[in-house]
């Protein structure tokens, strides 16, 4: 039963990483759904077993309910924002617990790490081949590969930095297989070189930082261990990576451009990549100003966009963003400084304790996989994707199992059965809600009534933000509304500050004689999208 569940979970996770289906508006929905499906299958392993919850996870469980509490007190006005935030946090917590319980026996722990390494290594190779096809402009010949937009390949992840982080985690899997002598060098070296080249193709600056961190971490750890991957090999592979990035890729691009009919995607030089990306500094400065505006309670979980709109006078990057591109700043802006610092301090101390006790190769390499995702989270938002977040939790649980005798409480198998049943119901309802939204949104965009039904109802039950979107699209901006309704719509617009939403909400405000508020949203439109529209133009638009 356990082996079958692990295999099914691995298959679903593989699909999540390789899925080419990216549809509006939740572009990674298929990947998110299958990632949660994999987690449900792992829960099934414990339907007939009691499960231990170690002491570090007890406080973490309390923290997972913060979004629901914020919703109860009105800080988050949309139920689905709070519920999805809770769902991601709770499932992340549950993956830590499951990873811990599955790895309490040292032999089982090593087998699980070997299985994870094989999986990551093989999917990394497939993703690398996809990225190379995109670089060569050959992806259109393969239905299972996404078309490339831009100049940085991303395989089926849709985002180059996400691909780079995943490939680095896959390389850590290769390192574990090498240390455990599970694959021959004639397989490991060419496959790892292919993955490394695909990582270079992404031109991810995050991967440079991860590489430097790995270099020094491995030097520090090898003094207490005797790894096969010793310092000379470490130096050779690190140098190989930077030579590929600085010299080999531009040379290959130049040669292939003249010799292949389709040409190749032109890539930026390492100097160009190093000299770009300064807009993050502007984002961070604006978020710091936003935190200063609401230091005690913050803006609510996953509501960075509201902070951006409300601190628009400090915006210098002229771009809308719904993440601070730094998980620490996000935690502070969502929860306020006191609670945010408590969460950051607790998690940091736990991670430090895990690292301090990491003495075997399994823990060291699992922590390197974790570090790749966490470093990325300091510069972007991989934690918002279930295909990163849930494996991250599982790996952290596996590392924690290096100390199997932690004080813990035992959760009865009946509780696990209830959790599994509720999770399955929510899983099916979310699939239903999203499918219903997609079907009805097509009708609304055609000017028709949203009459599609699933299971005899057209009402969206959990994903309320999508129901609000349907109502918003169908709403005539020349509609009289109460102060309360206008305020609720304003929160929705701030949390999804697209040009369409900002402009339409401005029309609605003008029609309801809220000219001062309308001018403020026109300023937001100008600062974020460089679209300068006067109040008189909005009035004229309403008079048509």
What does each model-identified segment do?
Residues 1-84, 90-118, 177-186, 405-491, ...:
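Transmembrane signal-anchor hairpin modules in multi-pass inner-membrane enzymes, especially those
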Residues 6-18, 34-44, 64, 68-71, ...:
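Alpha-helical transmembrane segments of multi-pass inner-membrane proteins
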